[in-house]
Amino acid sequence: MRYAASFTLALSLFSHAQSLVRGNPAKPCYPGICKLPDCFCSGTEIPGNLSVSSIPQIVFVSFDAFVSSAPFFFYETLFDGSLKNPNGCNISATFFVSLEYTNYCEVQDLYSQRHEIGHNSISCLLPSSWWANATQEGQREEILGMRDILRKWGNVKAEDVKGYRAPYIQVGGNMEFKVLKDEGFLYESSMPTQKFTDPPLWPYTLDYRSSQDCQIPPCPNGMCES
């Protein structure tokens, strides 16, 4: 049974050699032109035309907001080494960390255990409409500021903070994505879908127009130009 509220997370990867241009509509994506490893069209086709039986089940585990003693106890229980990936390595997660209430010693512990550390902004300001309407400078202060805080207080290398999830999964349109691209982030994890649930949407790049439904506008519609 498909629930109306169900969604998958689309991780929109950025091409290093291109820049997002605000207000310039993206062109349609053609798989014959947009090819891995640097480009991939949005959709449900398995990368590399692999068969379903030839790929493992992929589970993306992530947590939002602050890291403190109470949830850290749960993380220690969940990631105690008893659950393994097919290659024998321990499972891991991505933590999208925000400023308030976070214990940065525990962030460092998670980082040293090879969990991924992303972030969820500094302030998680309310109302959520702030994130939809934020200026480029406002987005930059939140996005760069939290990465710098993780570096200073959590001892997380800035270059290892590659992912961002907007507060309340309220994306900021082309403005937000331009800041992320300009500052070297590799993916964004804030865009839910109701259209692509079975089969699910695969991670895709923003070199061309996305086919994903926009559940929480404004979604990016600009194009990446050389």
Language-model features: locations:
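Cleavable N-terminal signal peptides of Sec/SRP-targeted secreted and luminal proteins
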Residues: 2-19
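Active-site beta->alpha N-cap acidic-glycine motif
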Residues: 20-116, 123-128, 138, 142-202, ...
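A charged helix-plus-loop insertion that forms the helical arch/lid used to bind
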Residues: 131-133
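A conserved mid-domain beta-alpha-beta active-site/ligand-binding segment of alpha/beta enzyme cores
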Residues: 220-226
